[in-house]
């Protein structure tokens, strides 16, 4: 995922490891080229809050970026691990096709994905979710005016004023114009204006400082993560978790109504809505991947024998021991529930 909204030469995006909050609002509100200072103050407060929900700024263990990373990490790890079931020739006996391992892996995968998707789409007002972020940004969209979007962190509002700040006889200026070295602030301003043109539906000759993003943009984003296909997630959550033993069709790409293509579609919609909000509407300006980098050696050891042949009997014995313990949990229930030394 990238936040570069224009020419790569301008470098409007920074690397993900850089602190997005460190320098973003280094310029005081009073020194910004913004007419409505109180509006900018309100925007900055909300922007910091929105970024903490997303995963930058104040620590939030359930932030949206971490939720998405966990969801995608689990998804890719499962699919890559399970792929050997079909990639290895059918005649070769491998533990990857063991009915028990297949059942446990498949069940864990489906449950983790359904829960992750449902959590990101939770519409509650007390959770950190994509739905809540979308609703909150829309609610406060009057803060996001063109002048705040372009000049709210110290950039010039009028990018055409660059010509008054340079030596026009400079060969670099004559060749590159606004993209010449030393004019980065003006080039960024120009790009942000162009992006806001798209968001606001305005042409360059219609620009005003108080342009805002229309509600239709937010309605479109909401439609991407709403409707019957997303309502099904709630039903799937209940069905898969409450009746997990019957939810799996071993070795198939469908789990009683949950398909890989369906999961792909829901994941993609969530990722794209988050990109629209964080990268375009809130202009985070950070380049980062959608999927976290895989740890070194993530699949190391999967080529080893799962257990020696004589371990099967020990597994059966362990099952029997655990069963005996749990079957004894009902013993003495009546005596314990009816005995209370503190009863009158």
Which residues fall in each region the model found?
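Histidine-centered, metal-coordinating catalytic motifs and their short helical/loop contexts
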Residues: 223-250
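Amphipathic alpha-helical interface segments
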Residues: 2-228, 255-344
